[in-house]
């Protein structure tokens, strides 16, 4: 799976979780960019990521995610071993 494909899938998950059409996730997207972001929606997003990409997100990874690029980096490592 390429990074572009990961961004596309992540964007779909964000749109679903935050119920926002047209939301685009980039390397610089952060919680501050999404008014609907709460601790509960974040946990729902993590669950959706786990289901979509087929791995369990570790707490240390969750805590390191500050921007979309951080998420993609973790997903890329887990999915592609990179």
What are these regions (language model features)?
Residues 2-47, 51-82:
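Phosphopantetheine-dependent thiolation modules in NRPS/PKS and related acyl-activating systems
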């Amino acid at each position: 799976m390429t990074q572009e494909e990961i961004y596309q899938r992540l964007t779909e998950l964000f749109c679903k979780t935050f119920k926002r059409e047209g939301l685009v996730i980039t390397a610089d997207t952060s919680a501050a960019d999404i008014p609907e972001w709460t601790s509960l929606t974040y946990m729902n997003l993590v669950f959706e990521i786990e289901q979509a990409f087929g791995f369990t997100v570790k707490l240390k990874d969750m805590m390191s995610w500050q921007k979309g690029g951080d998420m993609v980096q973790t997903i890329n490592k887990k999915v592609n071993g990179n």
